[in-house]
Swiss-Prot record:
Other noteworthy facts: The active site is at the interface between 2 subunits. The proton acceptor Cys is on one subunit, and the charge relay system is on the other subunit.
A biological-process GO annotation: queuosine biosynthetic process
Annotated pathway: Purine metabolism; 7-cyano-7-deazaguanine biosynthesis
Source organism of this protein record: Bacillus subtilis (strain 168)
Cofactor note as given: Binds 1 zinc ion per subunit.
Active site, renumbered: C37, H78, E129
Protein name per UniProt: 6-carboxy-5,6,7,8-tetrahydropterin synthase
């Protein structure tokens, strides 16, 4: 069971849900400057997705927890992240760093949420790579990244 305290995103919505999961995945950063991380290695990532909104769907959900798990865990668990199209380009916004993994998860979750009638929004994605290292992605309102 996960029992974490995460940095909180400020938002104006009435409802907020958080979905925790673990993902076991390998990756490498194909840059000399990445040091040891330039070699294939793995992590058991801890991922927390925060979704918020004002309206519930017909089932009384903001979004079904199982769909969030399928979108993330179902896509990345027990894989080499570099093999995914999301991380296959050789540019800084496609390398499977913790920062890019968090933003990519956000992009995928928000794309799904945009299809829902009740229009919830992903306000934060937290990705912990090690016990001492994590990244939080929060989209900027009206910016290119959110």
């Amino acid at each position: 069971m996960l029992s974490q305290i995460y940095p909180q995103a400020q938002h104006p919505y009435s409802f907020e849900l958080n979905k925790d999961m673990h993902i076991s995945a390998a990756h490498f950063i194909p840059r000399e400057s990445a040091g040891a991380c330039s070699r294939v290695h793995g992590h058991t990532y801890t991922v927390n997705i925060t979704v918020a909104g004002d309206e519930l769907d017909d089932s009384g959900f903001l979004v079904n927890f199982s769909v969030l798990k399928k979108l993330v865990h179902g896509n990345y668990d027990h894989t080499l992240l570099n093999d995914h199209e999301d991380f296959s380009q050789d540019d800084r916004y496609s390398l499977p760093t913790t920062e890019v993994v968090a933003k990519t998860i956000y992009d995928n979750v928000q794309a799904y949420l945009d299809t829902l009638e009740n229009k919830p929004t992903c306000v934060q994605v937290f990705v912990r790579e090690t016990p001492t290292s994590y990244c939080v992605y929060r989209p900027k309102k009206g910016g290119l990244n959110g």
